[in-house]
């Protein structure tokens, strides 16, 4: 300590016990903040930014991203928890709770003189055993719609209220089943999430097609067509400047007229090609024809297309081009040279919807769409943001379940069973590392305890009941948050993701052991030397 002080008199140093106390209090502080929003009965947090923006949430990931955390150890834990969300999409709050609890349990033994290194050895042994146990209790099953709905509901109910969660569950599962291809990874970008600020949140629905957030740019174009051909292209239908900076000089006004005509003809030829194709495929029938272009379309071209009864949308987003071809079929064209009927997609219904100043174009009734849209509705911005965060987590939960091919019982059942398995395993560990295993087992119980506490039940009483029921029946028993009584999680259809639990065990143990082994904290960066 003196050495650092000699080199840098301004350095701040915390040694041995003090360093550990600082770290443990930081972990417990963060744990106290997130403790109350675990599970379906958790409470909300209101975050007010410096500019006065308000955000209401109970999603641990959103909280940790938005909170300004000053303490270095607390921000380290927050980073680990948000990394957990990036990898698996869930488990942020559990992560913070378990790390805080591991340090709290370890602190009890360290205060009695046990060396942190011995506890960390116990933690490692316990982690290995817990992972083996997780392999035994995971339930491999056919990922049919029923199972996926249970998985999605379990995840979504922790983010939004039950009634809304049930509406979102079906939409989320059906959207994944629509975009899922055999033996290919699921690409969640193929689910577009579109917001509309009106009606109530339970009107959120799944559109088996695409919703674009702009409408046709011409007043004479039809607002609704049925049985429509869709042409997706990335071709400029407006006059563009040349790529190299060039200029034209003309001697007389006639020459200028010719030049303008030549420029117009260039674009008119492209428009004519589209119109010819429309006449070819539609004939005299009243089938619709829609052009969705990534680049611009000028007023003359819009006029010509409108006269032929073609709906044209310009400047569509690039990400929507890929979604369009997946939803409606067809091929996205970069030039109109090889324009033929095979390039066209098809949709049963295309219509424009106006909401205040905004226009939306719905492309629906597609045959077997490989890209779908979740249309979120809500009365205000807070609700929309909350639903959006929830849907993202719900989509990830369903994707994880399909990728893992297995699930584990939720409601704290796995943690209760794992703690009991670790207590039985404890005698086979040599020496004082047994205490580390005991600390790990006790720390895992924070999950069922907090679930019960947030639902308004006595946490000790509930935990004792659940443990007794588990010992008697040998089944994986969790907490029924409506009654506070034990219940078999699998029968109630409460499933968690296997990969989330696995990641939890890995990351919590690593961070808790690293924090325990810190015996000196120095704030002695270059900036503190100046002045």
UniProtKB/Swiss-Prot annotation:
<feature type="modified residue" description="N6-acetyllysine">
    <location>
        <position position="388"/>
    </location>
</feature>
<feature type="binding site">
    <location>
        <position position="412"/>
    </location>
    <ligand>
        <name>ATP</name>
    </ligand>
</feature>
<feature type="modified residue" description="N6-acetyllysine">
    <location>
        <position position="5"/>
    </location>
</feature>
<dbReference type="GO" id="GO:0005524">
    <property type="term" value="F:ATP binding"/>
</dbReference>
<keyword id="KW-0007">Acetylation</keyword>
<feature type="binding site">
    <location>
        <position position="39"/>
    </location>
    <ligand>
        <name>ATP</name>
    </ligand>
</feature>
<dbReference type="GO" id="GO:0032212">
    <property type="term" value="P:positive regulation of telomere maintenance via telomerase"/>
</dbReference>
<feature type="binding site">
    <location>
        <position position="93"/>
    </location>
    <ligand>
        <name>ATP</name>
    </ligand>
</feature>
<feature type="binding site">
    <location>
        <position position="94"/>
    </location>
    <ligand>
        <name>ADP</name>
    </ligand>
</feature>
<dbReference type="Pfam" id="PF00118">
    <property type="entry name" value="Cpn60_TCP1"/>
</dbReference>
<keyword id="KW-0067">ATP-binding</keyword>
<keyword id="KW-0547">Nucleotide-binding</keyword>
<dbReference type="GO" id="GO:0051086">
    <property type="term" value="P:chaperone mediated protein folding independent of cofactor"/>
</dbReference>
<feature type="binding site">
    <location>
        <position position="90"/>
    </location>
    <ligand>
        <name>Mg(2+)</name>
    </ligand>
</feature>
<keyword id="KW-0460">Magnesium</keyword>
<feature type="binding site">
    <location>
        <position position="496"/>
    </location>
    <ligand>
        <name>ATP</name>
    </ligand>
</feature>
<feature type="modified residue" description="N6-acetyllysine">
    <location>
        <position position="365"/>
    </location>
</feature>
<dbReference type="InterPro" id="IPR002194">
    <property type="entry name" value="Chaperonin_TCP-1_CS"/>
</dbReference>
<dbReference type="InterPro" id="IPR017998">
    <property type="entry name" value="Chaperone_TCP-1"/>
</dbReference>
<dbReference type="GO" id="GO:1904851">
    <property type="term" value="P:positive regulation of establishment of protein localization to telomere"/>
</dbReference>
<keyword id="KW-0143">Chaperone</keyword>
<feature type="modified residue" description="N6-acetyllysine">
    <location>
        <position position="199"/>
    </location>
</feature>
<comment type="subunit">
    <text>Component of the chaperonin-containing T-complex (TRiC), a hexadecamer composed of two identical back-to-back stacked rings enclosing a protein folding chamber. Each ring is made up of eight different subunits: TCP1/CCT1, CCT2, CCT3, CCT4, CCT5, CCT6A/CCT6, CCT7, CCT8. Interacts with PACRG.</text>
</comment>
<dbReference type="InterPro" id="IPR012722">
    <property type="entry name" value="Chap_CCT_zeta"/>
</dbReference>
<keyword id="KW-1017">Isopeptide bond</keyword>
<feature type="binding site">
    <location>
        <position position="92"/>
    </location>
    <ligand>
        <name>ADP</name>
    </ligand>
</feature>
<keyword id="KW-0378">Hydrolase</keyword>
<feature type="binding site">
    <location>
        <position position="411"/>
    </location>
    <ligand>
        <name>ATP</name>
    </ligand>
</feature>
<feature type="binding site">
    <location>
        <position position="158"/>
    </location>
    <ligand>
        <name>ADP</name>
    </ligand>
</feature>
<dbReference type="GO" id="GO:0006457">
    <property type="term" value="P:protein folding"/>
</dbReference>
<keyword id="KW-0963">Cytoplasm</keyword>
<feature type="modified residue" description="Phosphoserine">
    <location>
        <position position="205"/>
    </location>
</feature>
<feature type="binding site">
    <location>
        <position position="92"/>
    </location>
    <ligand>
        <name>ATP</name>
    </ligand>
</feature>
<keyword id="KW-0832">Ubl conjugation</keyword>
<comment type="function">
    <text>Component of the chaperonin-containing T-complex (TRiC), a molecular chaperone complex that assists the folding of actin, tubulin and other proteins upon ATP hydrolysis. The TRiC complex mediates the folding of WRAP53/TCAB1, thereby regulating telomere maintenance.</text>
</comment>
<feature type="binding site">
    <location>
        <position position="93"/>
    </location>
    <ligand>
        <name>ADP</name>
    </ligand>
</feature>
<keyword id="KW-0597">Phosphoprotein</keyword>
<feature type="modified residue" description="N6-acetyllysine">
    <location>
        <position position="287"/>
    </location>
</feature>
<feature type="binding site">
    <location>
        <position position="159"/>
    </location>
    <ligand>
        <name>ADP</name>
    </ligand>
</feature>
<dbReference type="InterPro" id="IPR027409">
    <property type="entry name" value="GroEL-like_apical_dom_sf"/>
</dbReference>
<comment type="similarity">
    <text>Belongs to the TCP-1 chaperonin family.</text>
</comment>
<feature type="modified residue" description="N6-acetyllysine">
    <location>
        <position position="377"/>
    </location>
</feature>
């Amino acid at each position: 300590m003196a050495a650092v002080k000699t080199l840098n008199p301004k350095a701040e140093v915390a040694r041995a016990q003090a360093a550990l106390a600082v770290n443990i209090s930081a972990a417990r502080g963060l744990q106290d903040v997130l403790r109350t929003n675990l599970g379906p009965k958790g409470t909300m947090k209101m975050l007010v930014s410096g500019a006065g923006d308000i955000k209401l949430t109970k999603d641990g990931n959103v909280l940790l991203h938005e909170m300004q955390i000053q303490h270095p150890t607390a921000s380290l834990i927050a980073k680990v928890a948000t990394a957990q969300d990036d990898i698996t999409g869930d488990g942020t709050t559990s992560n913070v709770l378990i790390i805080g609890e591991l340090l709290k349990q370890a602190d009890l033994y360290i205060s009695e003189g046990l060396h942190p290194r011995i506890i960390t050895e116990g933690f490692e042994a316990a982690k290995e055993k817990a992972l083996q146990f997780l392999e035994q209790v995971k339930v491999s099953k056919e990922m049919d719609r029923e199972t996926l709905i249970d998985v999605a509901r379990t995840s979504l109910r922790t983010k939004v209220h039950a009634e809304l969660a049930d509406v979102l569950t079906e939409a989320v599962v059906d959207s994944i089943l629509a975009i899922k291809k055999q033996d290919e990874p699921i690409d969640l970008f193929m689910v577009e999430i579109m917001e509309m600020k009106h009606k109530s949140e339970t009107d959120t629905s799944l559109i088996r097609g695409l919703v674009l957030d702009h409408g046709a740019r011409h007043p004479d174009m039809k607002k609704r067509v049925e049985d429509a051909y869709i042409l997706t292209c990335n071709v400029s239908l407006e006059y563009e400047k040349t790529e190299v900076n060039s200029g034209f000089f003309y001697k007389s006004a006639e020459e200028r007229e010719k030049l303008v005509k030549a420029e117009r003809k260039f674009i008119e030829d492209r428009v004519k090609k589209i119109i010819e194709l429309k006449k070819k495929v539609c004939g005299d029938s009243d089938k619709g024809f829609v052009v969705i272009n990534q680049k611009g379309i000028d007023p003359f071209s819009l006029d010509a297309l409108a006269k032929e009864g073609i709906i044209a949308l310009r400047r569509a987003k690039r990400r929507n081009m890929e979604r369009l071809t997946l939803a409606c079929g067809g091929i996205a064209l970069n030039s109109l040279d090889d324009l033929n009927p095979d390039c066209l997609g098809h949709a049963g219904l295309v219509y424009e919807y106006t909401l205040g100043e905004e226009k939306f174009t719905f492309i629906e009734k597609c045959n077997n769409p490989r890209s779908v849209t979740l249309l979120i509705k809500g009365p205000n911005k807070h609700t929309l943001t909350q639903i959006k965060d929830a849907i993202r987590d719900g989509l990830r939960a369903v994707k994880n379940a399909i990728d893992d091919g297995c699930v584990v019982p939720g409601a704290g059942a796995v943690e209760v069973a794992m703690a009991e398995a670790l207590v039985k395993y404890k005698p086979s560990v040599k020496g004082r590392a047994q205490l580390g295993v005991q600390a790990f087992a006790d720390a895992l119980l924070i999950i069922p305890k907090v679930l019960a506490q947030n639902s308004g039940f006595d946490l000790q009483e509930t935990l004792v009941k659940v443990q007794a029921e588990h010992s008697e029946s040998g089944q994986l028993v969790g907490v029924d948050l409506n009654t506070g009584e034990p219940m078999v999680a699998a029968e109630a259809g409460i499933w968690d993701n296997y990969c989330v639990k696995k990641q939890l065990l890995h990351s919590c143990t690593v961070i808790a052991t690293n924090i325990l082994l810190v015996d000196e904290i120095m704030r002695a960066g270059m900036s503190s030397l100046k002045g």
